[in-house]
């Protein structure tokens, strides 16, 4: 089951969430020493959503995965999209768990009036699955570190 966590739940389970986020940060994240505090602040303020996939057996709760999403707005095109910022699975989850999770995220995106769900990944398996679901996988994310590019260009 995938559930959007409330701020008090995020605070309660922050150590578990923090590990998952650190293991799955996207390539746009710099080396700001305060990045995890900033991510936590963004979640607690509601700017970023934290989702937990978990299983309950009586009193025990087992986390299967953590995802962060964020509604992004492109003012040039007047478009709202839901960015899947991070996804982390603690263990290989059942197909039903991923399908249920994706449906939850799709419903959330629709409720937020998003026209697309967007993400980036370096996992070929996830690219293949996204393509099978109808995603356009023709684009390549190409990040440049500004300081490194400046040095390289200066040496041309």
How would you name each of these model-derived features?
Residues 21, 33-34, 76-89, 106-110, ...:
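Long, low-complexity, intrinsically disordered polar/charged segments
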Residues 119-156:
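Active-site/acyl-donor-binding loops of N-acyltransferases
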Residues 79-134:
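Acyl-donor binding region in acyl/amide transferases
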